[in-house]
Amino acid sequence: MTAHALPNPTELRLALRENGYCPVPVSGPGMNVNSAGKRPVMPAWERKCLDASPDEIRRWGTLYPDSTNTGLLCGLLAGVDIDVLRPDLTAAIADRARRILGPTPLERIGREPKVLLGYRLAIPADKIQTAGLMWTD
């Protein structure tokens, strides 16, 4: 197993901002909050993260020291979240998404084979969510 050095959350957030993203400080996995590791704890984070300056981003480390995870503000960023546990179906759905939407270098695998494909948008979009699908044997 190879050990990878994780970037300091502030350095990561500043780099994301420099590359045109809006970083969001997110609760660390050990915090005593609902959805720990996935939930922003900053009040009004949707507004504050939209135009946070580098100085503001540096302050987050002091104001929210337990928010060690980092999310990205959507709107001009969308994700195709493929939460399918069959590798063959995940691959087929991801291939179809890439054929329709185009290739993307932004790919995240959490619990394999589930995958999220990230795309930048030309104009902001509201969240679109499909109904949950249940497959029977």
Name these PLM-found stretches.
Residues 1-137:
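Conserved phosphate/metal-binding and DNA-contacting active-site motifs used
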